[in-house]
Design a protein with these regions (language model features):
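C-terminal and inter-domain tail/linker signature
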Residues: 1-139
Length: 139
């Protein structure tokens, strides 16, 4: 499996909540360099916990890879997530409010020679997310 296909497969696995496939794609020593990752368990268990939480908050969550490219051991993806806040965001103190979201994030992943993802750096457009959820005034 090449690096581009690994990212596509990972997004499908998260969407399907297929955490066995997530374990196949993320290395055992996986490290997430993302805001809030310190609140999660380390490694791929933390990545799976974050995804599970997003499905609780947004049970109708859909993600689309808008852009994806790679060179060497790195891939860069631009992902768009849509959904409806049915479960709230406990980490932000936001209750369920049925507001729709449409938010982007950028992710850089480092792939190992074993074909697995070993590190990810990701940044979501959190200000837009907070505005869409009514937790921050619009600009």
């Amino acid at each position: 499996m090449d690096n581009i296909e690994a990212i596509r497969r990972l997004e499908r696995a998260y969407g399907d909540q297929d955490y066995g496939t997530v374990d196949e794609i993320l290395a055992e020593d996986f490290v997430a360099h993302t805001p809030g990752s310190e609140m999660m368990p380390p490694g791929r268990e933390g990545a799976k916990a974050a995804d599970m939480g997003s499905h609780v908050s947004f049970p109708d969550k859909k993600t689309v890879i808008e852009d994806l490219f790679g060179e060497g051991d790195l891939t860069v993806s631009h992902v768009r997530m849509t959904g409806t806040n049915k479960g709230g965001l406990a980490w932000a103190g936001i209750p369920a409010n049925d507001r729709p979201i449409n938010v982007d994030w950028i992710q850089i992943s480092r792939h190992g020679p074993d074909g697995r993802i070993h590190e990810t750096w990701a940044q979501m457009d959190t200000p837009t997310l907070m505005m869409q959820l009514g937790a921050m005034p619009g600009m």
